[in-house]
Amino acid sequence: MNNENLKQRTRAFALSVIKLVESLPSDRVSNVLGNQLLRSGTSVGANYRSATRAKSPADFVAKMGIVEEEADESAYWTDLLEVSGRLKSVVARPLIKEAGELTAIAVASIRTARRNASESKAVPRSALRTPRST
């Protein structure tokens, strides 16, 4: 999945979260859990966009770490809304699934970035040059 596809996917996730929160009942618990979900769910896309503009591999890893945390947190709040009876499974499960997939993508991106960073440090630049045959 390329950067633009993931930007669109995280945006669609945020829009799904917004629609879900707007559909919640107007009681104290729904408001508190809904606000938490709204914050974490919309943060996934914002932090991913920020990660795509990272200034270094370490900056990218840090920002993708936030994406991972926020996506996982979104699954948590959605699950709480479901088990507390404020959200039907048919609505909650797809959002929890997408949050899990976004979490997995973030984890894989972090692992790849760390591996690439360690490989580039392990190979001296001079070793990258191919000697000319004479």
Model-derived segments and spans:
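Short, C-terminally biased terminal segments at protein or domain edges
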Residues: 1-134
